[in-house]
Amino acid sequence: MFKESNNFKKFESKVWLSSPTMHGPEIEYVKEAYETNWMSTVGKNINEVERLACEYIGCKHAVALSAGTASLHLSMKLAGIEAYGMPKVGHGALEGKKVFCSDMTFDATVNPIVYEGGEPVFIDTEYDTWNMDPIALEKAFEIYPDTKIVVIAHLYGTPGKIEELNAIIKKHGAILVEDAAESMGATYKGVQTGTFGKYNTISFNGNKIITGSSGGCFLTDDEEAANKVRKWSTQARENAAWYQHEELGYNYRMSNVVAGVVRGQFPYLKEHIAQKKAIFERYKEGLKGLPVSMNPMDLENSEPNYWLSCLIIDKEAMCKQVRGEQDVCYVKETGKSCPTEILEAISSINAEGRPIWKPMHMQPIYRLNPFIVRDGNGRARSNAYIAGGVADVGMDIFARGLCLPSDNKMTAEQQDRIIEVIKACFE
């Protein structure tokens, strides 16, 4: 139970969850774009970002786009056309079709399915990595055997059980779209995330492991797909002497100015990952003895990028906490705490934490969408049926988990104070 009388000293400057870390070369590349007047969506910076993405991630083709969401959208369009054929103008490539997707993720993973008229089917999470559960995915194919597309995200920079998941996807003749927006630089059995799917995405949003303030990249080994994305992202203009359009296009290309920032960030990817890992290890050591554990990882097979350090409170150490759609309340209890209390305590010293992603099947906009757990339809179970166990894994992690300040500019002294605040919540 956190007491206001603890009087922890506030940080003069806010300690952020994860903010951009600049090094110097970024501004030089931005100046280069300005001084050469390459300020639009073509230029050397863009070319270099695409080259560096292929080099660092290990794919054959990269297309720099305005956001990771843009890449996911065009990935869904590609996958939909491959699976179901070209739609008529005004109709999405996934119209009326189900798409399996990660449940515990940010909505940017899921929304592109809906952009193309598809119906997301949410697959429950597993406790080992907090990612899509292969057993639940297999069950989903039993229930909806005609589904041809699966979207998988790697939560907070930790690779999921991608080999097992991919084997299931291939067995059922489906297409994997990989969302590596949070996991750039992470590897599974030595292979970079962002290369396991046929169509893949990384993000350069302001809070990511490297950033351009915005932006993302479409990654693939399929040259034809890369060319199609490049065309669609520039309004699908045909190679004619006039403005001619035979397909629906989008204004999704990355600015050469933004690309200058991304270009300057790429050489620091490994350094940023090392800093994030040190933060994770300091939390892990500092929180020993508390009834909490850090976000889990399969270190035998994968190397995360440690983007965000998270914790989950032991069930018996949870005080009473009730969340509505936008409000929350909890009851302080000696020796116990909850995510809300810890987040409030962290905020009181001018540091930023956040709740775990609220699972998509719990979101009001998607509350009527199918949700699959290990034993079948997660929407169809009665209270009596679930009385003896967890309602679903994602809901449980959301209830007990939170993201800790993970900024790679945070000092050891600042982190030690945050750890002391967390300890005080369990007094």
Stretches with model-predicted labels:
Residues M1-M39, P405:
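N-terminal "arm"/small-domain region of PLP-dependent enzymes with the aminotransferase-like
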Residues V42-K98, P112-V114, F122-D124, V191:
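Phosphate-binding glycine-rich loop
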Residues N47-L52, Y56-A62, I135, K139, ...:
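PLP-dependent aminotransferase class I/II
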Residues D103, V121-E126:
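Short beta->alpha connector loops at strand-helix junctions that form conserved
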Residues M104-V110:
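Conserved coil-to-alpha-helix start sites within the AMP-binding
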Residues G117:
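Structured binding elements
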Residues D128-G212, C217-L219, E224, D407:
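Active-site phosphate-binding strand-loop segment of PLP-dependent enzymes
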